[in-house]
Amino acid sequence: MKRGFDKKYILIIAPLITAIWLLAIYYFKGIYPFGTGTIIDCYLYQGGIPIYDYVRDAWHGGSLFYDFTTACGAGRDVTLALLDPNKLFLTFFRRDMIPNAVCILLIIKFCVVSFTASFSFLKLFERLSPTWLCAVSLIYTFSGFNIEYFTNLDWLDVVALYPLILLFIKRMFDNKSKIPYYLALTYLLTVFTYLSFFVIVSIIVFVGLYIFIIEDKNKRKEDIFSLGVGTLGALVTSSYSIYRYYQLISTTARFGFTKSIFNNEAEVLNAGQESFEFIPDYLKLGPQVNIVKLMMYFGMELAVACLILIIIRAIREKPLRKYASFFTISFLLLICQTFILGVDMFWHFGSYVMFPMRNGYMIAMLGCLLISYYYNNIDCKDGIRIKNNIAKITFALVTCFASVILIVPRIKVFYKMIPAGFDVLTQEFTLLKSMIYPFSTLFLFGVIGFIILKAIDNKHIRSLATLTILTVYFSTMSFALIGNAENSAKAKEYNSYYENAFEVGNIYEKNDVFSRVNNPDVSLITNYPYIAKIPSISNWTYMLSQSQIDAFIAFGFSNAYTRVIDSGATAFSKSLLRVTDTVSKDELNDDLYLPINNGQGNFNCYRNKYILPVGIVFNNNICNIAPKDYENTFEYQNKIYSCFGKNDELFEELAPESINTSNDIKDIKIFGGNIEKTEIVRVNANYEISNKKVIYLSCKNKNVSIDNIAINGEVLKTPNLPDYEGMTDRNVSSFPSVFNNNVLELGTFENCKVEITITFNKGDFSDLNIYGLNLEKLEELCLEKSENEYSVNKDKVCLNVTTDDSDSIVFIPISYDERWKCTLNGEKTDVLCIMGDFIGVKAQQGNNEIFLEYSHKEDILNIVCLIPLFFIGLGIVILLGKKQRIIPRSCFKLLSCVFVILFCIAMIVLYIIPTLSSVIFALIK
């Protein structure tokens, strides 16, 4: 066969090898379809699967514009979701099959990545042998970024498109069509807007370096013009989609939210640097590296070895120097992002909680380009006649295999111990020493080993030895890190999440949007409402506004990062928000809940005893109440209660009859099994409870840490997520915790004495709010309010309410959004924002027929604009491309100046400022 013909087969061979190897991993690990193992992990189980469920439901009869499922509703446009191949593929599966379908989807994704990589390298490196063409494609496919972040399935689309974008840019520079680049970038900007900006930045930085270093001076202006035309066309086409994306995300709590692994260091550092408060914390930290970032360099030992060999040869051969300079500078810039936290943060637009180096696939791409360039241009010249090749091969094999033998067990052990994966392997210096130093050292050994292999004179033997090592290295690591094996603790855990959600969904499948379910013991994952297809408060979509989150916090619900959590709240606030049903693995208070399944199944299911109707009527004082004006949720809820025309209080602050305090020393187990002694304060408080009350506790500040709570001598079990073995010795009664940090229910008592014993790790009794909710008053309120007729159709709500006067406000338990439009008895009226972030409508005396409809204008405009903008952008690319020769040279010069300015800004903002800041603050620390 001809060599060219063989190369074309690589487009099939590389994806085929990828599919076979992944199926082998699935088979030996018992992953679906070969067992109950799963690839679900990290982001996918809490974020990905629930999103796929929601989009599937929206396209199977739900609303494309509004989501009633969680957090009392939020706008959510999924009209363009089917342009996303993930969501399109999963739309054809039953809801209960989606957790299994993603296992198949991952194989497809990896095959697509290997195909696009092999296609791009085939076109970019024409002399590259079929063997190495296949090898670099597989190196890119199973790179550290992909096997670390494969659960973020959407990211793999960008990984697949990135080689094509670079190929299309190179073809533009060779005076080929600009349309492929325009189409690829337009698709990225429209469907994956956030991720596409990593690509835009990389084009400015790395393609800019290519233009300035490698391209001839007389061709630079033409290249910049071609790049500018293609990019401009893509930006024009996707302009409204970009505007809509940032318009939506700028209103969310995630926008500007900065909390990451450096928080503890930043707090310590800031203590002596008050004069630098205006500078972001991440610029004040010195070099910051963790195992997640280093994983981006997995398999790049050969690339670094090739870079060193290119530099050595460039010293003797002048034509190679510009390529050596380009690869070296690009590699150093990526190293800056790895070690300087500020650089990584700027690449992420200022914040992230986890998943550092979201553009880490660029390291793999640069590495593959290095390897391809080396074997395409240099390897044929690189034979060195040295005797005793067997010794050289043996030493290299031992060196490289040592990295596999020594580091894989470490990674497997820690990966098994830490359910969240690599993202938390930065919290302790023990982890730093245990993982990062060996990883770095063995990486260096691998580089040395591959360089030594170059001493083999026979080209085929040294290639075979190199490929053998790479095969063992990549297959071992990918097998270890992709998927959770059948019967493993993590596979059982993740499978149980969905089984539990499906069970709850079957029980409450008939609940409408105003019959919300609550999971106070957080035994279900945060996004269980999407999996179970039932309405609830619990939400983790990153799409809630801060005011929306604050409104739930004011009602007593817990909050973690951008999550709203079911734990916390009071019987009164739940009744207001129409929490009608409760599900828990623990048995709950019979005074508040009515059992409905008699403990059958994995959960105890209850009907809430205290439920207020939809469309409850307040007096107009409710419009003047703001949560921030009250010291705690109980005073705030008392004020809301008064807007029913009540002159007394629903919540009473409880004063203890006596308090006894004692100090003690307790041993606390910390990570690694070490014991640390800490001083604790134990408080006994005695109360005389009159009438029937539910006692609630909350903390006045964030400095309180309670080790345990006992009521009348019996330890109280507080709602929280399961403890992670080996990380902490958390008592089942600790409070507050990450996912239970607002209001804690202590129990219901009637005309009796109650002894509350609280053991503090931090803080004391004066830091607590302890209130009692009068159940007789709440019951009276619920009985005097009659139900109102209502109906919900997708994103439309009809409600009939009767009021006694014209100075009333109808409260509708839906989160406020200015896009809600309302008619009252056929006439347009304003939708009011009350109680922080909920909907109110000013009522008329008598019957009120209220009709709410969520406006789709902006969402529909997004679709309508996309089509004409596509042709406008395409026209710009075609017209300017064809007329390039007659365009005045001044335009080329102007565009070149603009590009140079953008390049300089990118270098200063992304690299120079954070690097200098890191060095300066490290010196003055």
Task: Give the positions of each predicted feature.
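Membrane-interface coil-to-helix junctions
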Residues: A19-V113, L138-V159, I249-A253, F262-I291, ...
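Membrane-interface micro-motifs in multi-pass membrane enzymes
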Residues: G75-L80, P99-V112, W132, S137-L166, ...
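Transmembrane catalytic cores of multi-pass membrane glycosyltransferases
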Residues: L44-Y54, H60, F198-V201, K217-A303, ...
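Active-site-proximal, structured, solvent-exposed surfaces of multi-pass membrane proteins
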Residues: K2-F5, L654-K925
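Membrane-embedded helix bundles of polyisoprenyl
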Residues: P15, C111-K123, P130-I214, S226-Q247, ...
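Transmembrane alpha-helical segments
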Residues: V113-F121, L161-F173, V205-Y210, A303-I311, ...
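Extracytoplasmic/lumenal acceptor-recognition loop(s) of multi-pass membrane glycoenzymes
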Residues: F68-R76, L470-K492, I507-L576, I611-L612, ...
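Contiguous transmembrane helix-bundle modules in multi-pass membrane proteins
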Residues: N175-I179, L183, L195-F197, Y323-Y497, ...
